[in-house]
Amino acid sequence: MKKLLLFLLLFPILSMSQGIMGDKTEFSRQDTLRGSITKERSWWDLNRYHLDIKVNPDEKFISGSNKISYTVLDSYNLMQIDLQNPLNLTKAVQDNSELEIIHDGNAHFIKLIKDQKPGSKEEIIVYYEGNPRTAVRAPWDGGISWEKDENGNHFVASSCQGLGASVWWPNKDHMYDEPESMLMSVNVPKGLTNVSNGRLVGVDEMSDSTTFHWEVVNPINNYGVNINIGDYVNFSEIYKGEKGDLDMDYYVLSYNLEKAKVHFKDAIKTMQAFEHWFGPYPFYEDSFKLVETPYLGMEHQSSVTYGNKYRKGYLGRDLSGTGWGLKFDYIIIHETGHEWFANNITYKDIADMWVHEGFTTYSENLFVDYHYGKKAASEYVIGTRRGIRNEKPIIGPYNVNKGGSGDMYSKGANLLHTLRQVANNDIKWRNILRGLNKDFYHKTVTTQEIENYISKKMKMNLKPFFDQYLRDIRIPELEYKLVDGKIHYRWNNVVNDFNMPIDIIVTDHVLGLQNKLRIYPTQKWKSKKIRGSIEIDNNYYIDSKNVI
């Protein structure tokens, strides 16, 4: 019964990871077209999108266009644009000339007539329409959520991480390349409001509809682009942050206004904690928004979506089992954490998705640390270990749009918590986290870049450490035995050259003293004189075994 209750408690997170990553082991041409940097993608660099669409909730229909501005890197005449069935890419135009489109599943290859000269800046407009995929279980099995609120008004939102933004609009659907800016013009029926990323720069009123123009002036990843349509009301506040005044806006359903004004106080607390640990919020120019949606939530850039039903924890549950998880709204903290790790620092390939989810799950621990103390934070992150399965590596296969194990959440957080112990210097550790967000500001990255950066800053060879926790499923096991006043110890169940230092707590029962002792195990037996009994510091994510 205890195992059943634990499974039911952790099911949402397990479902989240399985929905986005799945269990697929065989890959198709479509997977490669979607997941690799094809020749038809690599020759041009994204500059800007202008997505101009009309959303018809009654018919669950979207139509419109995307003007794509780009810089030519290498001369070529075939451009890949992605749009998923059942949507139809109907036309492509450059310099008033309609272009031929070769359709290959969800990839569409546009034959360009104009000579594409390296260094030149060009534009192409693609047109599309249709009934986009309806989200089955958003946000994990995403698409468009076509819902109604309690008053019978349309309540519509997009979610597409993993699945891809091309599920609802045409784009260069690979994470390695981001536009430097984006304009979203979204036409919706009269009486409804659309909220998207960035700042509202214009509203056009028509007799039966309204067009909302939202602009982002920072780089944005495709899945971070969103539409949220409903009977929204707005309230706002100013956060005095590290880069000055940050506009924080909240869009909620009209009947939830008073409830939200109280509950959303977690947003300011989140900014305080994360600016302390990670550095300035990365998108001051675009503001910060929390937007109510009919699904649980997602890290859409500067337009974080929220559907946790105004409860503390994860829909009222504490994923750590410690009680600390009920001190805050999980969705506000977790999804806002992604503004630093997902939207500021973005993986180039979804195989490295732990860079998003591991660091952001770890951010929950840092929120607790900032507001409730280091001991509480340790209890929280250690409590999340019960959700770790260790069945598949965290790093997934490359170039096929496939993530790794769902362990990237809790195991990712615990490997970072373990690294904090190894660093043994909280000022240094905080500087590393802030340095990541400064040195990789608005960049797409590989896990190798992140691993190398941390290794360099810690002045350690951490390759075996990352190989152990990211690319292996075994938990390091510290074998030890106490013989004649000595502790003998070694690592077992580890990759070659794994040599992580670890702290043990030594209690001298004669003198009544307790102190922390750092040892440096390898895969060969080593020994050290001690006096008293020992306890392994449980802040390290390892197993231990007394072999006597």
Regions found by a protein language model. Give the residues of each.
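Extended, low-hydrophobicity, Ser/Thr/Pro/Gly-biased non-transmembrane segments
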Residues: 24, 28-30, 40, 127-236, ...
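Hydrophobic helix-coil surface modules that form long, contiguous segments used
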Residues: 64, 172-333
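Amphipathic alpha-helical substructures
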Residues: 282, 405-487
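Zinc-dependent metallopeptidase catalytic helix centered on the HExxH motif
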Residues: 160-161, 268, 273, 284, ...
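Beta-strand-rich binding/interaction modules
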Residues: 88-94, 462-463, 478, 482-539
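A surface-exposed beta-strand-loop module
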Residues: 20, 84-147, 209, 526-529
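N-terminal, polar/Ser/Thr-rich
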Residues: 17-63, 95, 147-155, 463-464
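Acidic/His/Gly-enriched intrinsically disordered linker/tail segments
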Residues: 217, 353, 357-418, 440
